[in-house]
Amino acid sequence: MSCFKQDVYNCITPKTLSFVKSFLKQRSNDPAASTHLSSARVVEWNLNGIEVDSRARDELKAAVNILFRIMKYIGQFPFPKLSSKDDSEIISLTVQEFVIASVFISGRYRKLFGNDNGEIIWKFLFIALSHQSDMNFFEDDLDHLFTIPLKYPIEDGDSIAIKAQKVDWGGLEIIKKLSNLDMNQLQLQPSLFLNLTTLFLLTESIPNQKHNKMHDQFVHNLTTWKDFRKYSLDLLRYMNNDLSKDDLNSQTLSWSEFSLGMNNLLAPFVEVNLRKVVENNVLNISLPFFETSANSKMDGTGDEVPNGATTGTKTTMKENEGAGVEAQSKEETKVGNDVESSFGSKLVSISLIAYISSMLRGIGSTIEVTRFNAIKLFAGLEAGFSIRSLENKIYKWHAPTLLFVSGKRIKQRTIDTNRRYQEFDETYPKFFQANEDLLKSWQYTNDRITYCVLINQPWQNSNKKNFGDEKSLILSLEPRADYYTSLHSEILKGQLIYFNNSGMGLGFGNAQPLNKSNNKKYYPGDVSLTIESNLEFAVFRHLGSLSTNATTYFNRSRLPSTVAHEDFEDRFLITDLEVWGIGSKKELEEQQRQWKWEEQQAEARQSVNIRNMGEERAFLEMAGLVGNNGSGGSL
């Protein structure tokens, strides 16, 4: 079938017309009722009256501009055309472009093209971020006739919606061109992608709820943009672990690195949060779409202002009755008490929880972690770095836990002078030769190293036998994202954890350590994390080039780069160690009631001891064992 560009666009939109109507709160089917939306307007809408540091403000602007660049490129499907290469240029979307982009972002395009073309949106995203001005597949000619393939013949009486169902969307020329395109000729700019993933990670921290609450929490979390940015860079290092924060503008990501990174970990994170930003309207993207009428106003930027809103006043979409836009005062948009700024932890934050949540989703874990179902059980900085203290705090929790361990890479001075480290090193088997360089190209002496272990089963005293199941996994959080899942084995059955309170510490992916008289020795697995008994030093080991005699409990890295086949260790001095319980609201309430009861019992016992002290002292004085002056008696 031959038709013009606009006819093709018209065939796409009926498939999602009802969705778009409800989302945009359109009050008319008249195309003249809406106009364009600029990226600058969206940023202004969200930052109005909000105190955010200048760098965060600039990077949010860049992220929204990049988002609009991607949406504009996708929104011109099936005749995509890249806009200007200038990142600072304000990008505007028409309603038609917004609608078509939403078809892809919402995932509804799969109904049109089939699941075989699921990678198409990642190609569009990569091309849009690659800044290749020559990647326009079609002439910009509205009068040119295009041929579109059909599944079924078009009849004269068919409506546009019926015609859309008869089009073979998967057979479009653009799909063929994308399939044959050598994507490796393109290079993605990680500095652009970093701003976008920071926006997505911030969105990840916001649970699905009413729109006004989601937007309030988004605005609140903007104040910690730099924390989200730090973890976003760690996520991007999953694609290329050589990315440096100081030199991002001169670095690139290849299509191979990008596609493997997306497929192995990041695709669910990007897909879910891209949809949340646009479809759930966290950024209020659709609000500045407005009716063109005599009652509309103009603000100082040259954009029109929706009816009912005043210039310089923040607005949010009304949740019920679909009544469009309603003005709210700054007091009404302040974040409520339910928005927590921190967890009372030096290590764990809202941004870190969002980071872990995104990784667990990408791995396919059934365990969900949010700021609402996590409770701190142990913190070394509060309770002391003691194996007994750790044991007392975590053994009463009967749901999954997350163990965080963080510190600084061991330096040569510690190796040469710290006797406690030397004793630990003597009991931990060496793999590398003394003359080998222990640091790989992506490892630096000043690295902050952070690992997180997901323990699905309750903690057990395991001085003789390991415990655990195959849902256990190790997450590398800093300086780069990576993950190590439990190896499926009918023999091991995921029993890969020990908690040894008799002098050998904690092991994840290790065999039981030897601890007899003066003979102590660790047996680390090829992929393992070992924490010595004083909770002072830790070692993560990854042997990827060859198999050793050690039992393998965890799978090796699936990093797209050469890391999967590398032998390396992260040895670090522990500065923070925390354990957090993950459970339902019911489990949290039951655990809190149990802790409260135990505190009351402890206070009662202390009270009894104080009351009985007088009687006990009297007997001791009568026996002459304690003098009246309280300094002891004489015989």
UniProtKB/Swiss-Prot annotation:
Pfam families: TLD. Keywords: Cytoplasm. One of its GO terms (cellular component) is cytoplasm. InterPro entries: TLDc_dom. Its main location: cytoplasm. Residues 297-333 are annotated as: Disordered. Residues 346-583 form the TLDc domain. The keyword Zinc-finger does not apply. This is Restriction of telomere capping protein 5. It comes from Lodderomyces elongisporus (strain ATCC 11503 / CBS 2605 / JCM 1781 / NBRC 1676 / NRRL YB-4239) (Yeast). The lineage of its organism: Eukaryota, Fungi, Dikarya, Ascomycota, Saccharomycotina.
